[in-house]
Design a protein with these regions (language model features):
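N-terminal pilin/flagellin-like segments and related low-complexity appendage regions
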Residues: 33-285
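N-terminal single-pass transmembrane signal-anchor helix
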Residues: 4-35
Length: 285
C-alpha cells in the first residue's frame, strides 16, 4: 500500500453503516403508510370511475341503475320496467360494463377485499306512477325538474351527507351545521338529498365492533348477518347493508385520523351534475 494513501477508519465505516441503517429503518417504517395512501388513492380513482359509469348509464337510459345483489352476477337487480328489488346493494359491474377485482359473487371489491356499497334513491314524487322516480323507465322525464315550492325540484333524492352523525336521532345528522349536502333540517340547500351514494368502508371494514359514524354508514338496522366476505371465496356470503326502507338515508363523510379511526370513503353526485348531463343527452326536458 502506498504510504501516501489513506483509507476509511473503522470509526468512519461504523458511522456510515449507522446512517445507512437509520435511513433503511425510516424507509421500512414509512412503507406501510405509503402503501395505505396508495390504496386510498386507488379507491378514489375506482369510485370516480364507477360514478362516471353510473352517470353515463343515466345519459343513455334515462334512469339510474339499480344495485346488484350477491346472487345477481353483477347485474342490476330490478329497474327499467319495474323499480329496484333492493335500493341498497352493490355496484352492478356487468350492467355498467366495468372491470376490476371481483369476488365469487361478482361484487366489485375495494383494496381491502370488501365490496363497494351502492345506494340509489327510492323517492317517488306523487305523479301517479307509484314507483321510484330515479330507476324506472320514463319516470324522471315524466316527473320533471321544476316545482313552484321548496325545494323547487320534483326529482328529489333523499340521501343526506354530513360530517357528524347521531345514532340517537334516528340516523340523521347531528345538527344543521354539519350537513355537507342535503337539507334534512329545512335550513339550507336547494335539494333534499343526493340521488345516489357510493361507499368504501375502508381498511377497518372487517371490524364488527364499528361504532359511531362508521356504524351509521354500515347500517343501524342490520338487514343481514355480518359475515365478512373472503375475496374470491365461496359465493353466497352475507353482507351488512343500510336499510333505506327503515329510514336509513344519512351518510357520514369526514377526514380520517379521528380517535375512532373513521376511514370510510363516501362519494355522491349533486343533482346539478346528474341532471345537466341528462339534459345534454336529451333524457330530461
Amino acid at each position: 500500500m502506498n504510504p501516501g494513501q489513506k483509507g476509511f477508519t473503522l470509526i468512519e465505516i461504523a458511522i456510515v453503516l449507522l446512517i445507512v441503517t437509520i435511513l433503511l429503518g425510516y424507509t421500512v417504517a414509512l412503507f406501510p403508510r405509503q402503501q395505505e395512501l396508495k390504496q386510498y388513492r386507488d379507491v378514489e380513482r375506482k369510485m370516480d370511475e364507477v360514478i362516471a359509469a353510473i352517470v353515463g348509464f343515466a345519459q343513455v337510459n334515462g334512469r339510474l341503475p339499480c344495485p346488484a345483489i350477491p346472487n345477481s352476477a353483477g347485474i342490476e337487480d330490478g329497474g327499467g320496467v319495474a323499480e329496484c328489488n333492493n335500493f341498497g346493494g352493490f355496484v352492478p359491474v356487468n350492467t355498467l360494463g366495468l372491470s376490476g377485482r371481483l369476488n365469487a359473487d361478482s361484487l366489485l371489491l375495494d383494496p381491502w377485499g370488501n365490496p363497494y356499497r351502492y345506494y340509489v334513491s327510492s323517492s317517488d314524487f306523487d305523479d301517479g306512477g307509484g314507483v321510484g322516480d330515479f330507476v324506472v323507465n320514463g319516470e324522471m322525464q315524466q316527473v320533471g325538474l321544476v316545482s313552484t315550492v321548496p325545494p323547487y325540484l320534483d326529482l328529489d333524492g333523499q340521501f343526506i351527507i354530513c360530517d357528524l352523525g347521531d345514532l340517537t336521532l334516528n340516523d340523521i345528522c347531528d345538527a344543521p351545521a354539519v350537513e355537507i349536502f342535503g337539507n334534512a333540517f329545512g335550513a339550507g340547500g336547494p335539494y333534499a338529498g343526493a340521488p345516489f351514494v357510493l361507499i368504501s368502508h375502508g381498511k377497518n371494514w372487517s371490524d364488527a365492533a364499528a361504532a359511531g359514524d362508521e356504524l351509521i354508514n354500515m347500517g343501524a338496522t342490520l338487514t343481514t348477518a355480518f359475515v365478512p366476505p373472503i375475496p374470491n371465496g365461496p359465493a353466497g356470503s352475507a353482507y351488512l347493508l343500510k336499510d333505506e326502507s327503515a329510514g336509513e338515508t344519512t351518510f357520514v363523510r369526514r377526514i380520517t385520523g379521528f380517535a375512532d379511526d373513521f376511514d370510510d370513503v363516501v362519494k355522491w353526485v349533486s343533482p346539478n351534475i346528474l341532471f345537466s348531463k341528462m339534459i345534454e343527452a336529451g333524457q330530461l326536458p
